[in-house]
């Protein structure tokens, strides 16, 4: 099964992300991390409202506040499902494409701790964004 990303937009706003662009962004993030996306299967990106991501953040991270992006690994046979990235465009400080890459990097095993700007993850994210934007 070739790597692909499904996009589910549950927002009332004008957030736009095509499955093709989401696939390109995630593929580039995984390749940057030395992973072979073609062996990974499927990933989903859900665009949600602030109250939805707030509930998820409370349930899974015990944080009683909305956030911009959450990533969830999905256990399953290798090559079927990688996980889900949940993004709240209304809570975002980064742009939508950066949040997709950010979520994919979390799924690849990266973390940034409390200081994102000083992290290796921030440097990798910047390289990926420069590559996909042709800079």
Swiss-Prot record:
Keywords: Cytoplasm, Endonuclease, Hydrolase, Metal-binding, Nuclease, Ribosome biogenesis, rRNA processing, Zinc. The keyword Ubl conjugation does not apply. It is an enzyme of class 3 (hydrolase). It is found in: Cytoplasm. Its EC number is 3.1.-.-. SUPFAM superfamilies: Metalloproteases ('zincins'), catalytic domain. This is Endoribonuclease YbeY. It comes from Rubrobacter xylanophilus (strain DSM 9941 / JCM 11954 / NBRC 16129 / PRD-1).
């Amino acid at each position: 099964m070739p790597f692909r990303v499904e996009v589910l937009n549950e927002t009332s706003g004008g957030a736009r992300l095509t499955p093709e662009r989401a696939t390109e962004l995630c593929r580039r993030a995984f390749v940057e991390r030395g992973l072979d996306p073609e062996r990974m299967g499927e990933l989903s990106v859900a665009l949600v409202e602030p109250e939805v991501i707030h509930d998820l953040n409370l349930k899974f991270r015990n944080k009683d506040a909305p956030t911009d992006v959450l990533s969830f690994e999905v256990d399953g046979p290798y090559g079927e499902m990688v996980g889900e990235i949940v993004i709240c465009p209304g809570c975002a400080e980064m742009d939508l494409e950066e949040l997709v890459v950010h979520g994919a990097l979390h799924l690849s095993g990266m973390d940034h701790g409390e200081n994102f700007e000083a992290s290796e993850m921030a440097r990798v994210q910047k390289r990926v964004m420069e590559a996909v934007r042709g800079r």
